Every structure is written in C-alpha cells, then in structure tokens.
C-alpha cells in the first residue's frame, strides 16, 4: 500500500517539519506571548468602559440641559422666600436693670425706736423736717409719762360745738394704740398730730389727741411709713367744679416762689373773688406749677400739692 500523503515531507514555508518517525506534533509558533494577549484584552476592556462612561456623561448632560430649558406649556412656580425669623436671630436676653435710686414718690416702711426720756412728738417732727418726707404712724408700743390729752367734753360740746377739754395725766402709762401723721411743714390744719390710747396702773383706759410733749418713759417702738409729694383733695367733688378743672379754666392763680421752710401757703386771688379759687401750694417746686393763660397765672388742677424738697438719703 502506498504511503499516505501526510506521511511524506511537505515543504511549507514558515513551518518547521519533523521527521516522519516523530510521534508529537508541534503547534505552530505565532510569536505571541501570554502577557501580550492579556494586556491587549485588558486594554480592549478598558477602552470599552471609557466609551460607555463617555456615552453616559453625554446622556446626563443632555438630560440636565433639557431640564433647564422650559418646555412648551409648562408653568414655572416662582421661588418663595422663606418666612419667619432666620435661624439664630432670636432676641438676645436683655441685661438685668438695677435700680440704684428709689422713686421720690415711693412709700417706705420704717421701724423707729425712740429712746427713753425723749419727746416723741418733737422727735417725729424733726425726722420729717430733715428727711423732707411725710410720716404716717401705724402703731406703737412702750411706756410714756406725764401726758396731756385733748378730749371732747359734754359740757363744752353743748356750749359750743367742737369744744374740747384738756386732760393732764401724771404718772406712767402703757401705750395701747398710737396713730397719727407728720408733714414737714407747712401743712394744712389738722394734718399733723398724734392720737393715743393709754392704760393706767389701775386698769383705767384713757385716750385722745396729744397736746404738748409726749415724754417716753422707756424705749418706744413705732411702725411707720414715709411718703413725699402728697396731694390735698377736697371731697366730694362737685360736677361743675370738676368740669372747670377738667377744661383747664379757673379764676385764681398760684404764685410759685417760696420753697421749703415754714410759713403760710402762698396763693393769689388775682383772677376773681369767687370761693373756688386755685388751692394753695405747700412747699411745691416751681417746675410743678402749671403755666396759666394770658388772663392770669397758672393754677393747680383743684389739688393742693405737698411736694417737699428731696433731702439727702439716710443710707
């Protein structure tokens, strides 16, 4: 049998031939290494990925460009400003206010101790004059001696209404009640004085308005309140008088001038001779007197003011 054609030596260019007796066949060498093949595959994969990313970026750019462009028939809602207070702009807490000076019209409370052997009335009058404040005695306790009281007498009242009898008491007496007021003069009649009730050694109780000195036989404790710028009112107010005062009209005028010190109230009746003239001013500063019109001086609005000059504070 003839040899097959593949067993013979075939001369092929670029291929190495082996002898017929070799049992192995060599693969053709294409001069391509594995590293080169892997690099080419990786480069191809990376190239395809970059192309895909570029395409995605182009698509996003197109979409974003389409969003900014208004479409036909679309209604754009206007941007609303945020309402309310911006964050962090709340009112800061205000610093505390410290009042370093009391109002001159403030009512002050006092606990007064009067030493033994001292005249209670003279001590209170001196305190009111030096501090330029009115004193209202609310209560008191202690022991006094040799008291002179004014009491209403039945015979005196029958003979002349308003009459009173003076009673002089000798010895020591315990204070049951003590009330009254003191103004740093000048003051209207009846606005200054003390009313006292006493208990004797044998249990008798007497009382009345204090006349003359009131000597303390031991420490006397008083509860009092002081005030300033008192206003005197005449009650009841009549309708016509109230209307005139409300309208600012009046016939009389107040003459400012004397401030402090003693003396009678200063008033002028230059306007007219009727009884409803401007009420007198007691120790009132000139800047508190209202200016009058062309017909006369200023007039207080139906009130009698006791605006005493402010003295140096005791603390």
Curated annotation (Swiss-Prot):
<keyword id="KW-0391">Immunity</keyword>
<dbReference type="InterPro" id="IPR005175">
    <property type="entry name" value="PPC_dom"/>
</dbReference>
<keyword id="KW-0611">Plant defense</keyword>
<feature type="DNA-binding region" description="A.T hook">
    <location>
        <begin position="80"/>
        <end position="92"/>
    </location>
</feature>
<keyword id="KW-0805">Transcription regulation</keyword>
<protein>
    <recommendedName>
        <fullName>AT-hook motif nuclear-localized protein 19</fullName>
    </recommendedName>
</protein>
<dbReference type="GO" id="GO:0050832">
    <property type="term" value="P:defense response to fungus"/>
</dbReference>
<feature type="region of interest" description="Disordered">
    <location>
        <begin position="239"/>
        <end position="285"/>
    </location>
</feature>
<dbReference type="GO" id="GO:0005634">
    <property type="term" value="C:nucleus"/>
</dbReference>
<dbReference type="Pfam" id="PF03479">
    <property type="entry name" value="PCC"/>
</dbReference>
<keyword id="KW-0238">DNA-binding</keyword>
<dbReference type="GO" id="GO:0003680">
    <property type="term" value="F:minor groove of adenine-thymine-rich DNA binding"/>
</dbReference>
<comment type="function">
    <text>Transcription factor that specifically binds AT-rich DNA sequences related to the nuclear matrix attachment regions (MARs). Negatively regulates plant innate immunity (PTI) to pathogens through the down-regulation of the PAMP-triggered FRK1 expression. Positively regulates defense against fungal Verticillium infection.</text>
</comment>
<dbReference type="InterPro" id="IPR014476">
    <property type="entry name" value="AHL15-29"/>
</dbReference>
<keyword id="KW-0399">Innate immunity</keyword>
<feature type="compositionally biased region" description="Gly residues">
    <location>
        <begin position="245"/>
        <end position="276"/>
    </location>
</feature>
<keyword id="KW-0804">Transcription</keyword>
<dbReference type="GO" id="GO:0045824">
    <property type="term" value="P:negative regulation of innate immune response"/>
</dbReference>
<feature type="region of interest" description="Disordered">
    <location>
        <begin position="1"/>
        <end position="104"/>
    </location>
</feature>
<feature type="compositionally biased region" description="Polar residues">
    <location>
        <begin position="1"/>
        <end position="25"/>
    </location>
</feature>
<dbReference type="GO" id="GO:0045087">
    <property type="term" value="P:innate immune response"/>
</dbReference>
<feature type="compositionally biased region" description="Basic and acidic residues">
    <location>
        <begin position="61"/>
        <end position="74"/>
    </location>
</feature>
<feature type="domain" description="PPC">
    <location>
        <begin position="104"/>
        <end position="248"/>
    </location>
</feature>
<keyword id="KW-0539">Nucleus</keyword>
């Amino acid at each position: 049998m003839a040899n097959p054609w593949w067993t013979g030596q075939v001369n092929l260019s670029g291929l190495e031939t082996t002898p017929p007796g070799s049992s192995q066949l060599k693969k053709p060498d294409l001069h391509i290494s594995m590293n080169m093949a892997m690099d080419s595959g990786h480069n191809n994969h990376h190239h395809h990925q970059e192309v895909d990313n570029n395409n995605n970026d182009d698509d996003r750019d197109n979409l974003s460009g389409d969003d900014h462009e208004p479409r036909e028939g679309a209604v754009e809602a206007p941007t609303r400003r945020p309402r309310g207070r911006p964050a962090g702009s709340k009112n800061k807490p205000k610093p505390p206010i410290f009042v370093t000076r009391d109002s001159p019209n403030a009512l002050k409370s006092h606990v007064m101790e009067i030493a033994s052997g001292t005249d209670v009335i003279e001590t209170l009058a001196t305190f009111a004059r030096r501090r330029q404040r009115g004193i209202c005695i609310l209560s008191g306790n202690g022991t006094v001696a040799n008291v002179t009281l004014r009491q209403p007498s039945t015979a005196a009242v029958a003979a002349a209404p308003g009459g009173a009898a003076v009673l002089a008491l000798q010895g020591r007496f315990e204070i049951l009640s003590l009330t009254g007021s003191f103004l740093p003069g000048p003051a209207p009649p009846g606005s200054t004085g003390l009313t006292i009730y006493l208990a004797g050694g044998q249990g008798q109780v007497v009382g009345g308005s204090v006349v003359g000195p009131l000597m303390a036989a031991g420490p006397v404790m008083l509860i009092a309140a002081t005030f300033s710028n008192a206003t005197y009112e005449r009650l009841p107010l009549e309708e016509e008088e109230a209307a005139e005062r409300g309208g600012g009209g009046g016939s009389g005028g107040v003459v400012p001038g004397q401030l402090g010190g003693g003396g009678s109230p200063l008033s002028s009746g230059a306007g007219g001779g009727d009884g409803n003239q401007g009420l007198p001013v007691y120790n009132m500063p000139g800047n508190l007197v209202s200016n009058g019109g062309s017909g006369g001086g200023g007039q207080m609005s139906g009130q009698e003011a006791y605006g005493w000059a402010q003295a140096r504070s005791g603390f």
